[in-house]
């Protein structure tokens, strides 16, 4: 028994150090693994944190770039708007340069009067300028007027110098430069010296443009108190016309003639069809009141207004309607004088016998004297005022 106890003690004493050493190494190995695991875990945490930081930076950069892009877009739109405003300002400025006046009719007239007085030193001052509307094919009509109420040669020149009355046939040019039509007018003008040539292409459907051209050109050449347009198939008493206009000298803006308000024609087959009929309201409406186109007169300020504003004055199909439309909205006195539209005999003859001499005579149904080439002489004999009337008119120039 004693021997066994001794053996047990020896074994115990031998294995204790071994167990301690083994435990030590096992502890060291376990601790090393724990440290290794802990180190790996820390590295992963650090890596994850770094990635989070990088993602945050990238996100912030993206947001910054997006905001920057949006800011650029906004700035680009602002620049576009600014450029558009500048372009609009330039357009308005150009339009303002084309207009002589932009605020009111009174200002327009004041500007017109100033321009006229400035240029007056270079223009002949006269009482009235009469433009007789004619065409290439109307030679016989022109001759019928030369043989009746329109003075010729030296008398025509004397009428301008002594009475301040200018009477001219107004005509443009053909669509082909230096055509036979133009040369025929050149030859006729060389013979009579009674044409006023316009920078205008002749044509029946261009009468509104021709009227605008006449007033503009006449204002540029003569400083007149009145400007008159007459058709070449109308009989006129020059002395009565001059005296009538002289009675309105004190009025600054007058529009004189036989005022009417005819229907707006919409049918395509109608001779005087108005393509822009819709501007005048419902079907069946009438035009605003305007002077009939056979003869009318306007004062200096209105003619100058047309000249100054011709680029923006709208033209309708009918010339007389067009002229009336230009004065809508202006402070203009319309004078409806029925002596401007007497009928042919017996109407004008009866008036003459009653002491009421007509300014102009024509037939409404023909928009002029019917068969004027054949009948103008008869009308002149029965309704004319006499050759001395125009020379007796008191037209002292102001």
Swiss-Prot record:
GO terms for molecular function: galactosyltransferase activity. Keywords: Glycoprotein, Glycosyltransferase, Golgi apparatus, Manganese, Membrane, Signal-anchor, Transferase, Transmembrane, Transmembrane helix. Pathway: Protein modification; protein glycosylation. Glycans are attached at residues 110, 115, 206. It is a single-pass type II membrane protein. One of its GO terms (biological process) is protein glycosylation. Its EC number is 2.4.1.-. The chain crosses the membrane at residues 11-31. It comes from the Eukaryota. It is found in: Golgi apparatus membrane. Pfam families: DUF4094, Galactosyl_T. The keyword Membrane applies. GO terms for cellular component: Golgi membrane. Gene3D superfamilies: 3.90.550.50. Its cofactor is Mn(2+). Belongs to the glycosyltransferase 31 family. Beta-1,3-galactosyltransferase that transfers galactose from UDP-galactose to substrates with a terminal glycosyl residue. PANTHER family: BETA-1,3-GALACTOSYLTRANSFERASE 5-RELATED, BETA-1,3-N-ACETYLGLUCOSAMINYLTRANSFERASE. This is Probable beta-1,3-galactosyltransferase 5. It comes from Arabidopsis thaliana.
